[in-house]
Amino acid sequence: MTIQSIVENELVDDGHSVWLLNDHREFGYSDGAESEQYLDKVFRSAKDLSSRSSELEGHIKDWPSEYHLTSKRSQLLSGFTFDRSSRVLAVGCGCGAITRFLGETFDSVVSIEGSINRARLARLRTRDLDSVSIVCAPFQKIRFSQKFDIIFCIGVYEYSGWFVDGQDPYDAVLRYFADLLAPDGIVVLAIENQFGLKYFSNSREDHLGTMFEGIEGYHRHPGRVRTFGKVELESNLRKYFPCVEFYYPYPDYKLPDCVVSGQFLASQRAGELVSQSKSRDYSGPRQVFWDESTAALE
């Protein structure tokens, strides 16, 4: 199926094989012009764009480039078995690291990104994959003619308060996903843990760069961006999805060393494995007050 047959809105090609809504308006999320220009240069010159590309990893020079170029991004999903024929929607594709893996794994992927610069980078990363269509638009404005078997929302849900209007944007996003899901379909959602161990010790909140912001309830920056603990997240999800299953990437979903099931996490074997994963403060250097790996064993 073509993207025009899947999306009911009028679409226009921006000249870079990215599809735009006819009334496209720019979304201002960015890692910065310098970072995006660097990725553009790397992707254009790369011969191996795959999700496991050591060539791309050789161009890592800082945290933004590591996030977009490391093969660890795909490790979040590579341990799961998927049906290749599943109809897939990816919401918030960024610069294409996860979308690249999805395009290698599925025959049909529609990936949405609000920023035109990041959407073009995602298209460059997936330029050899005919299975992938990149649409630059606010996802909630797109009307689809089909349901999806799997919806991936990786590192996006926490920004709902930023780009979705309404009294409860986090609820609105989940309701949108539920309406788009085929019978027996699934939503794969990855988000940081509001009460992650590193936040009680020596790390600033990943999005806002403020110590203890999440564990104190985001009262300094209400309505901008927020993560959730397991209890609240599960409560949100069960309003629309009766079956909720948790998996735990360590140290986090961004750069996972391993992904374990809830059942394994409850076993006596889990502590030794997850204690080997070292968390990071992505805002910069941190002072270590106590050993997280030892605490994980407890």
Please report, for each region that a protein language model flagged, where it lies by residue:
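Short alpha-helix
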Residues: 222-246
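A short glycine-rich, Lys/Arg-flanked "PGG" loop and its adjoining helix->strand segment in the class I
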Residues: 168-186
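Rossmann-like AdoMet/SAM-dependent catalytic core
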Residues: 232, 249-298
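A short acidic, Gly/Pro-enriched loop at the edge of an enzyme's catalytic core
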Residues: 143-151
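N-terminal auxiliary segments of SAM/dcSAM-dependent transferases
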Residues: 1-48
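Class I SAM-dependent methyltransferase SAM/SAH-binding core
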Residues: 105-132, 138-140
